[in-house]
Amino acid sequence: MIKTLLIAPIRFYRFFLSPWIGRQCRFTPSCSAYAIEAIERHGALRGLWLASRRIGRCHPWSPGGLDPVPDPARPQQKNQGSGCCGNHSRTGLD
């Protein structure tokens, strides 16, 4: 429900205001498309954070270009990876 409430004004902008303003975004996908995808994929809080950061980067001095929404982080599995406390294996060189 919160996602729908956040996405509704973005869709309003895309369909009613954006045609009057013209394509101004320097990025692909556009900032409004990025915001919708970020909210749908990452949830309300993280999606808004990602969208806000993207809009902050969209200015006349930005080179723009391809900037897709990052993939959601997968939860780390216990005792996997290369942390200070993971993968304790003895090599016989102790």
UniProtKB/Swiss-Prot annotation:
Residues 61-94 are annotated as: Disordered. InterPro entries: Membr_insert_effic_factor_YidD (IPR002696). Keywords: Cell inner membrane, Cell membrane, Membrane. GO terms for cellular component: plasma membrane. It is a peripheral membrane protein. It is found in: Cell inner membrane. It comes from the Bacteria. Its main location: membrane. Belongs to the UPF0161 family. Could be involved in insertion of integral membrane proteins into the membrane. This is Putative membrane protein insertion efficiency factor.
